[in-house]
Amino acid sequence: MKKNTLSAILMTLFLFISCNNSGKDGNTSANSADESVKGPNLTEISKKITDSNAVLLAVKEVEALLSSIDEIAAKAIGKKIHQNNGLDTENNHNGSLLAGAYAISTLIKQKLDGLKNEGLKEKIDAAKKCSETFTNKLKEKHTDLGKEGVTDADAKEAILKTNGTKTKGAEELGKLFESVEVLSKAAKEMLANSVKELTSPVVAESPKKP
């Protein structure tokens, strides 16, 4: 959900809440009639929407970081910057590239560790576990990946999800992608459901007996 849309929703909620609060100081009979009708709890819904959107934005940051690893793997392994062609071939010198991928993986873990939401706890924990497993795999393979002359083959096994063999991290990276995808979908659904509560039908209570 776009930030402008969320801001508009929250502003509308604020106006509704303000109007509801001001009505309580007015006519008693009018208040009694109003209280017999139950609409959505706007204060509660406002918090749900704000919290849901914060989680979704954080997950999108993680998705962007993952995409950067994907982009590096697809386009930068075995390459160097060329003044005319953009990227030119330079095989088997991928040490700095792998160090960058590792740095991004630790940032992903940091972002996921900061996520807190009871409704998404299971999916957040699953993504955290996959993130930690991927980062640890890169560290475990430091003999092959922690040097300047990392071969193209080893680099692909570490961070290219579509590579034939994935023994140095690519398999774990694929699972991390999947877990974050599941988390993102759940976060979007949670936000959509919170917004839907705004349109919940008003329920009239049975009049109280004198």
UniProtKB/Swiss-Prot annotation:
A lipid is attached at C19 (N-palmitoyl cysteine). Residues 1-18 form the signal peptide. Changing K60Y: Wild-type virulence in mice, no antibody response in mice, decreased heart colonization-. Changing S206N: In strain: 2591. It comes from the Bacteria. Changing A103V: In strain: 2591. One of its GO terms (cellular component) is external side of cell outer membrane. Disruption phenotype: No observable effect on growth in vitro, infects ticks normally, required to infect mice. No change in ability to colonize the tick midgut, no change in bacterial migration to the tick salivary gland. Loss of infectivity in mice, including SCID and NOSCIDg mice (deficient in T and B cells, functional natural killer (NK) cells which also lack complement C5). About 40-70% more uptake by murine peritoneal macrophages and human macrophages (B.burgdorferi strains B31 and 297 deleted); no change in uptake by neutrophils. Whole bacteria no longer interact with human plasminogen. It is a lipid-anchor. It is found in: Cell outer membrane; Cell surface. Its main location: membrane. A major immunodominant protein in mammalian hosts. Required for the initial stages of mammalian infection. Interaction with tick I.ricinus salivary protein Salp15 protects the bacteria from antibody-mediated killing in vitro and in vivo. Inhibits macrophage-mediated phagocytosis of the bacteria. Binds human plasminogen; this probably confers an extracellular protease activity on the bacteria that allows it to traverse tissue. Binds human complement C4-B, which may inhibit the complement cascade. Experiments in mice suggest it may play another role after initial infection. Homodimer. Binds human plasminogen on the bacterial surface, also binds human plasmin. Interacts with tick I.ricinus salivary protein Iric-1. Interacts with human complement C4 beta chain (C4B); whole bacteria bind to wells coated with C4b. Binding is inhibited by human complement factor C2. The causative agent of Lyme disease, the bacteria has an enzootic lifestyle. Larval ticks are infected with bacteria during feeding on infected hosts (mostly mammals) which retain the bacteria during subsequent developmental stages. It is transmitted to the next host when it is bitten by ticks. During tick feeding (which can last for several days), bacterial migrate from the tick midgut to the salivary gland where they are transmitted to the host. This is Outer surface protein C. The lineage of its organism: Bacteria, Pseudomonadati, Spirochaetota, Spirochaetia, Spirochaetales. The gene is ospC.
